Amino acid sequence: MQVTETKSEGLKREFQVVLAAAELEDRLTTELAGMKDKVQLKGFRPGKVPVAHLRRVYGRSIMADVVQNAVNEANQKILEENKLKLALEPQIKMPEDKAEIEKALDAKADLAFQVALEVMPTFELQDHSDITVTKPVATVSDEEVETALKRMAEQSRSYADRPEGSAAETGDRVVIDFVGRIGGETFEGGSAEDADLDLGSNTFIPGFEDQLLGAKAGEARTVTVTFPEGYPAEHLAGKEAVFDVTVKAVKAPGEAQIDDELAKTFGLENLDALKDAVRKSLANELDAQSRRRVKKALLDALDARYAFDLPPTLVHQEFAAVWAQVEADLKSRGKTFEDEGTTEEKAQGEYRRIAERRVRLGLVLAQVGETADIKVPDEEVNQALIARLRQFPGQEREVYDFYRKNPQAMAELRAPLFEEKVVDHVLGQVKLVEEPVSKEALFADDEDEAAEAAAPASEAGASKGVISEGVISEGSAPSHETGAA
């Protein structure tokens, strides 16, 4: 087997592989000889079938296997001798001349084919000890605990029927039957019976609740509303609907009590236990946000520190995933790029830079994880799988079977776990400085990003430092199966 490099441009490599006719003949003969004692043919005793006869019967099919094995060996030889890591599966180009292939399959001519590769970049991991990352830290105030308790009490309070003839007010709960029509025709999801609606909660279509203010039990009303342009059900978006509504009951909210009884509705012994649980829950929220801010700052620092060529196809695939999300978001909101103050061309440029950032950070974190021999225990992957199953009540068995039979799906569960471990590892190398901040300051960046996210050209999606699942994977170079994050 003769291997010659014919192209080396950036991360693209091409090689010509030549299998001599004599080598093809030797490989075929070896394979046929190995079959001799295993094949049973009519008219021959076991193990006595002549190799020449086997060649006449099986030669072509065995030669196809010989060629495939040779291609695999050539790929492995190229990677090992040149110390390359693949970004994508090799592209094999066989001769276009069928007569040439026929001769090679008969071992009467050499077989020459091309191998095109897109490889991973090589770069040296740097010393990260000079990186300083600020960790914003906020604490839970007594006022925040009280506010949360009031909200829980309001959500848990009971409702009692108002006196007969009472008109519904903001804050009341009405029990209604309704049938909605668009153009005189009913539509799926537009009807319900005994539905509870808290007036002022803004849980129904804008304008629906307002038209029930003043209604009395037993009263029938016609409510006319228009579905928002960005309504999730696209077939309803922007359309006017008329609802025939029957008010069956008007109920007033009871007093919101913050006491031991409230705690018991949440399965806790007393109010003190509820306060502790609320404080812990709020603290967990602050800790999670602090983690997001720290991770973002770290990834920003790594992104600024590393510069190397990126596999074009990986970037293209990552961009395609991100861009699909952008287009879906615009469509769901009924917006265009012009509505957001940009153009499609400009937005594509910005999101291509986001894709490049994600791929670059994925490669850096993957190499850090490989160098540090970071592993994700199977137990943690199983816990992630259980959490995923809980998202599909009633379908747990089907979802479980899907993951167990789909290695790529399991890899997508493992990837974020691996990423967090790698981030923790790098955080252990940098200088982490805690900075006390208010809750408002801690979440300020999220508010800024939410505002930016409305504009397709913003980097809000990438500024959170999210590496798409599949770009970074445990114990290996990044996969070419990128997903959106």
UniProtKB/Swiss-Prot annotation:
Reactions performed catalytically: [protein]-peptidylproline (omega=180) = [protein]-peptidylproline (omega=0)
Domain of life where this protein originates: Bacteria
One Pfam family matching this protein: FKBP_C
One GO molecular-function entry: peptidyl-prolyl cis-trans isomerase activity
Compositional bias per record (Low complexity), positions renumbered to this chain: 452-462
Location relative to the cell: Cytoplasm
Protein name: Trigger factor
Lineage of the organism: Bacteria, Pseudomonadati, Pseudomonadota, Alphaproteobacteria, Hyphomicrobiales
Gene this chain is encoded by: tig
